Amino acid sequence: MKYDHLLVRYGELTLKGSNRKKFVNQLRNNVNKSLKGLDGFVVKGKRDRMYIELEDHADINEITYRLSKIFGIKSISPVLKVEKTIEAMSAAAIKFAQQFEENSTFKIDVKRADKNFPMDTYELQRELGGTVLKQIENVSVNVKRPDHEIRVEVRLDAIYMYEEVVPGSGGLPVGTGGKTLLMLSGGIDSPVAGMEVMRRGVTIEAIHFHSPPFTSDQAKEKVIELTRILAERVGPIKLHIVPFTELQKQVNKVVHPRYTMTSTRRMMMRVADKLVHQIGALAIVNGENLGQVASQTLHSMYAINNVTSTPVLRPLLTYDKEEIIIKSKEIGTFETSIQPFEDCCTIFTPKNPVTEPNFEKVVQYESVFDFEEMINRAVENIETLEITSDYKTIKEQQTNQLINDFL
């Protein structure tokens, strides 16, 4: 079947009333960015639907795949656009039915947005179904559990007919919900947290704390790869890599061993808070899950949050670990996240970290040293990378160069 359009159905943005135009425009911009590099199509965003007009050479499978990854899209269908006549609809219905397997069942489903069309829904269903039965042998009607469903949408401008409905990612268009800073550790949880907030229309930049030589270049490249996977959905993402060795060593020098984990997280939050204001973000996002580890109890969260007035969003707060793993596999980050390269959260880990830290004690331990200068120095020396979906690490670039030189 040669389709001439893709029908793109909006997600929750259809509920946005007077703000709908803003959401539709943002989604259209996101679609154009996602489809960059492809040709043979024209995007037409309308109030209730988006239509993508296809030329003969358009790569419909690649276009559909990319659309399915864009937040704000509920579903996509390859469609035939036909004239608003029963003859044109009947001819298209026969085209669809000619693709059916022998002895298969079908159903005609009609949605009539144009209430002025001369035939009502049931008349159209009977007429088109009857035409298929007359013209195509060895098929029958089954309205409850059909093998095939020919869908007909009667709209003001034309008739759109299709069979396939490809699920989209749902949610809201990224860019409609403000900017946040994602604390990206390299584990399983934080990439999922980032994906969850992006699904709500939020733009992210990411921050990663790197402590060489205790953490390796492989750990850094792992985080770059996780950011690249996230960027496949939304376009370029800025990754801010913080030199954290000096701060982490100082914490372990002056803070009681059982409190070093709590204090380390507080230092991370203080650095993140300064960066939030620099980049114009409105919140900090992390992958914390309530009660999962010592640093993620309510007592710990209270002690850590106290260093910032910036809202801290925890989209995975109540998830079971298995739920997070399933989502990680769905979005494609799991295999990268489980690579065995230590991040700064796993080094210097005390044997018995306190699970219910006393806030006054944390402050007392940290008061013996003024960390502000170190924090400012860490912020000043941040390395910022813009990660795109085709970003290559330095190691990959060097490998490619060696191959090219050899050839």
From Swiss-Prot:
Q: Which domain of life is it from?
A: Bacteria
Q: Where in the cell is it found?
A: Cytoplasm
Pathway of action = Cofactor biosynthesis; thiamine diphosphate biosynthesis
Which sites bind ATP?
A: M183, L184, H208, F209, R265, G287, Q296
Q: Tell me the GO BP annotations in alphabetical order.
A: thiamine biosynthetic process; thiamine diphosphate biosynthetic process; thiazole biosynthetic process; tRNA 4-thiouridine biosynthesis
**What residue stretches are annotated with the THUMP domain?**
61-165
Molecular function GO labels: ATP binding; CCA tRNA nucleotidyltransferase activity; tRNA binding; tRNA-uracil-4 sulfurtransferase activity
Report the EC number(s), separated by commas if there are several.
2.8.1.4
Q: Which GO terms describe its cellular component?
A: cytosol
Reactions listed under catalytic activity: [ThiI sulfur-carrier protein]-S-sulfanyl-L-cysteine + a uridine in tRNA + 2 reduced [2Fe-2S]-[ferredoxin] + ATP + H(+) = [ThiI sulfur-carrier protein]-L-cysteine + a 4-thiouridine in tRNA + 2 oxidized [2Fe-2S]-[ferredoxin] + AMP + diphosphate; [ThiS sulfur-carrier protein]-C-terminal Gly-Gly-AMP + S-sulfanyl-L-cysteinyl-[cysteine desulfurase] + AH2 = [ThiS sulfur-carrier protein]-C-terminal-Gly-aminoethanethioate + L-cysteinyl-[cysteine desulfurase] + A + AMP + 2 H(+)
* Protein family per UniProt: Belongs to the ThiI family.
The protein, known as: Probable tRNA sulfurtransferase
